[in-house]
């Protein structure tokens, strides 16, 4: 509790004690009783009266403070002092509870996102470390990150090796090993060795700064449910005030005209009860709190949602489109099959190809050298020639070796076998004879198949894969992962056209999400209903372009984000239905004179407390991550 909340708690206790003492006293003169009951009322309710008067002064009277002030002052005017005090006391109890709940949610999110560094260490000429504000550190400055400290600014390690804890950014507990030459991003915690880092960005442009801005501004983009409640309260509160006024005067006037007793006091009491019941606090407070909790819970899992509107749209997503490379696959090439001719060996074929490709920097060449797994003896390789669009030729141990595609083999007068192309084929010829081939492909991520299955379980109707790869490759990956539809051989511009077709084909109330790695995906991310950037740790483009940012490259996080969104939306609608149903029933009973002021207190404070308790569930995602 804050100091202000503790002070309010003491005021509530004091007011309750005074009311109990006054209730136990023998009957007193009416004027004395009024003055005595005004003491506990003002002790706990003065700030409500003050806010109501300020609202009237500013010509914005219709809020919960105005409703409570009119209801309680009216109760005092009717001589119902205990009920008047009870209404204001329990209203303040509800407000206190709501304040504590909201504060707890905000503190939980702040703790989850407590990644802002307080300082950066700069090494002076005498070797001593000076702590400076991260905002003052320029690009290219050498900073020192000691064990236990957060990396304050993005940069490259120039000296040292260590293990980094990235849990605050990715939600993953598995640490990451780094050494000289590796890039590091701000917000990670250095767990072991001392690191010297050359900064590559200013603090304002670093990853931690962008993430903090994203989380802080997430409440600006409100969901449809939030906007509905705001508009509803704007119309609802004045309407119930006029309704209460009509209830207080029209029935007794009609009764008078009919020659029956008017009983003005009874009808005014009903109107005051009507006012207490009608307070919209449960909705106005619990709906934003639910979305706030959902966004905070997602942040704890390394999923950054830029606003409650995207959380709501994610819950309504029924079509998910993937960019293959870097999203469903690792985006790195790997030798997955080695096929030597009869009489040859896999090791000798890989060795010949790796040595021939030893001078090439092409990703295919790098994957072959990785498969070889040994140091390249450059002295064994001579006369290297790289042939654009074909491959390479070289002499290895004095023998001519060629490694490349079928066109290179044809150029050498060699026939190659008919190989089903489910990846990149590198044919190898040694000493003028065909020696076999290597199959190289982009490796599917370990969790991709399960991620697609989880999306189906989360309510996704159709999954689509877009890729620039050839038809056989796209078909094989699609079949392996269980994707419903794929489109192959696409250029970057073709992806936007394909998205337009998918948007036109979906049902009106369905949302379409696109999942990319944030690289060159900005046009597509901005066109779809929900743009999701995966593996955005350190990617400025992804953080800027996407609506939902996954801080690591685990595709399973997409289904988790949808489960969080669906659970949050469910909580929101539970609160709306619950609050409106209880209030509607109590309003009817109050208007009929069946429900008294005590029932009104429950309908207001009780419903608000239960709705806020339900809303705080959105913050906790442990049971969702285990599915």
Regions flagged by a language model, labelled:
Residues 22-27, 37-123, 136-143, 150, ...:
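Actuator/coupling domain of P-type ATPases
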Residues 53-61, 97-110, 289-308, 616-627:
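Juxtamembrane helix-loop transition segments at the membrane interface in multi-pass membrane proteins
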């Amino acid at each position: 509790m804050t100091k202000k909340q503790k002070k309010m708690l003491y005021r509530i206790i004091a007011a309750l004690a005074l009311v109990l003492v006054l209730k136990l006293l023998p009957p007193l003169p009416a004027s004395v009783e009024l003055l005595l009951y005004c003491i506990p009322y003002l002790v706990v309710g003065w700030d409500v009266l003050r806010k109501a008067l300020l609202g009237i002064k500013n010509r914005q009277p219709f809020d919960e403070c105005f409703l409570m002030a009119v209801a309680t002052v009216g109760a005092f005017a009717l001589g119902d002092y205990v009920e008047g005090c009870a209404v204001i006391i329990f209203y303040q109890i509800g407000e206190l509870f709501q304040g504590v709940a909201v504060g707890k949610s905000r503190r939980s999110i702040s703790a989850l996102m407590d990644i802002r560094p307080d300082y950066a260490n700069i090494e002076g000429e005498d070797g001593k470390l000076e702590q400076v504000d991260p905002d003052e550190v320029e690009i290219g400055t050498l900073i020192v990150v000691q064990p236990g400290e957060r990396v304050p600014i993005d940069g490259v390690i120039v000296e040292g090796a260590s293990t980094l804890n990235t849990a605050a950014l990715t939600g993953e507990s598995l640490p990451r090993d780094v050494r000289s030459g590796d890039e590091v991003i701000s917000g990670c915690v250095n767990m072991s060795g001392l690191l010297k880092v050359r900064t590559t960005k200013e603090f304002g442009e670093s990853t931690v700064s962008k993430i903090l801005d994203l989380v802080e501004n997430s409440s600006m983009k409100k969901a449809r449910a939030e906007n509905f409640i705001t508009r509803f309260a704007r119309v609802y509160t004045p309407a119930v005030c006029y309704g209460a006024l009509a209830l207080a005067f029209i029935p007794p006037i009609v009764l008078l005209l009919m020659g029956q007793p008017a009983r003005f006091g009874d009808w005014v009491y009903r109107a005051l009860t009507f006012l207490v019941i009608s307070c919209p606090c449960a909705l106005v407070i619990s709906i934003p709190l639910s979305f706030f909790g959902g966004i905070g819970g997602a942040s704890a899992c390394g999923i950054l949602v830029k606003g409650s509107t995207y959380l709501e749209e994610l819950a309504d997503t029924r079509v998910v489109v993937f960019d293959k490379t870097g999203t469903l696959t690792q985006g790195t090439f790997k030798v997955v099959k080695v096929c030597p001719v009869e009489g040859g060996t896999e090791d000798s074929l890989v060795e010949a190809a790796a040595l021939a490709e030893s001078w090439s920097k092409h990703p295919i060449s790098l994957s072959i050298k990785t498969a070889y797994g040994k140091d390249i003896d450059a002295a064994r390789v001579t006369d290297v020639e790289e042939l654009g669009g074909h491959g390479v030729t070289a002499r290895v141990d004095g023998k001519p070796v060629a490694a490349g595609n079928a066109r290179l083999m044809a150029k050498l007068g060699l026939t190659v076998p008919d190989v089903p192309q489910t990846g990149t084929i590198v044919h190898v010829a040694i000493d003028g004879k065909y020696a076999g081939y290597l199959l190289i492909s982009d490796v599917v991520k370990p969790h991709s198949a399960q991620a697609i299955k989880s999306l189906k379980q989360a309510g996704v109707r159709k999954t689509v894969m877009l890729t620039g790869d050839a038809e056989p490759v796209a078909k094989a990956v699609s079949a392996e992962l269980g994707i419903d539809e794929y489109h192959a051989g696409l250029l970057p511009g073709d992806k936007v056209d394909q998205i337009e077709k998918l948007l036109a084909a979906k049902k009106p109330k369905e949302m379409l999400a696109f999942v990319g790695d944030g690289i060159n995906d900005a046009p597509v991310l901005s066109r779809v209903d929900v743009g999701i950037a995966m593996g955005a740790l350190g990617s400025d483009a992804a953080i800027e372009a996407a609506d939902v940012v996954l801080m690591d490259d685990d595709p399973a996080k997409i289904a988790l984000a949808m489960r969080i969104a669906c659970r949050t939306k469910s909580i929101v609608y539970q609160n709306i239905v619950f609050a409106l149903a209880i209030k509607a029933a109590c309003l009817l009973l109050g208007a009929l004179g069946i429900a008294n002021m005590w029932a009104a207190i429950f309908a207001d404070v009780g419903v608000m407390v239960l709705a806020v308790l339900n809303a705080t569930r959105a913050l906790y995602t442990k049971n969702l991550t285990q599915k």
